[in-house]
Regions:
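N-terminal Rossmann NAD(P)-binding subdomain characteristic of aldehyde/semialdehyde dehydrogenases
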Residues: 1-51, 55, 89, 94
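Short coil/turn connectors at secondary-structure junctions
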Residues: 26, 32-37, 61-63, 90-92, ...
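A structured beta-alpha segment of the ubiquitous adenosine-cofactor-binding alpha/beta core
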Residues: 27-28, 95-115
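Beta-loop-alpha module in the N-terminal Rossmann-like domain of NAD(P)-dependent dehydrogenases
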Residues: 38, 45, 102-107, 121-128, ...
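PLP-dependent aminotransferase-like
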Residues: 51-105
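Periplasmic-binding protein-like
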Residues: 56, 115-120
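General beta-strand structural signal in soluble alpha/beta enzymes
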Residues: 67, 96-98, 119-121, 138-142
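ALDH superfamily catalytic-core signature
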Residues: 116, 124-200
């Protein structure tokens, strides 16, 4: 997917009359240029997938990357960097820094060489990064409050099954895991009993 996307990274031109009030004899030109150094901060729950989804587009766009894997995923991050190296990515294009976020986090997100930050993690840390960084573009995927919504006409057996699967699959360590259930009062007690039966 990332390699295919790379084939379409080209400039564009937009006729001036595409915008109200602009003249036909003018055009807008869009060029795509590398940002420079992308800091990719990956979470623990999908240490390869989410790191690769940050690294690949950055490289395809001509940037170099500093990968900061989660402490619990440091070995995965180091091995992933090795895979890119063995695939022919030149030395220095992907760099990996490991350590606890509380020890090195503030330093790396405020480093003067970082031109863009791509972070996946908690809302709390995302807010901290946002406060610490000044004029550095940010792309963040932060923790959610994912809800299952159950209405009065729902199939309660199916709803209970999906709630349990949504909450407990992958040990609940997914950003999209069900974290709360919003259910109408008329079926709440029955739903609770069905969920309890599935998890006991």
């Amino acid at each position: 997917l990332r390699a295919d996307t790379a084939k379409n990274l080209s400039g564009e031109s937009i006729p001036g009359d595409s915008f109200p009030g602009f003249k036909k004899n003018k055009i807008s030109v869009v060029t795509r240029e590398p940002l420079g150094v992308v800091l990719a901060i990956a979470p623990f729950n999908y240490p390869i997938n989410l790191a690769a989804s940050k690294i690949a587009p950055a490289i395809v766009a001509g940037n170099s990357v500093i990968l900061k894997p989660a402490t619990q995923g440091s070995l995965c991050g180091l091995y992933l960097a090795k895979v890119f190296e063995e695939a022919g990515v030149p030395a220095g294009v992907i760099n990996t820094v490991t350590g606890r976020g509380r020890d090195i986090g503030d330093y790396i997100v405020t480093h003067k060489s970082v031109d863009f930050i791509n972070f996946t993690g908690s809302t709390e840390i995302g807010e901290r990064i946002s406060r610490l960084t000044t004029m550095v573009p940010l792309l963040m995927e932060l923790g959610g409050k994912d809800a299952a919504i159950v209405l009065a006409d729902a199939d309660l057996d199916l709803a209970a099954t999906n709630i349990v699967a949504g909450a407990y699959s992958y040990s609940g360590q997914r950003c999209t895991a069900v974290k709360r259930v919003l259910v109408v009062d008329s079926v709440a007690d029955a739903l609770v009993e069905k969920v309890k039966a599935l998890v006991s």
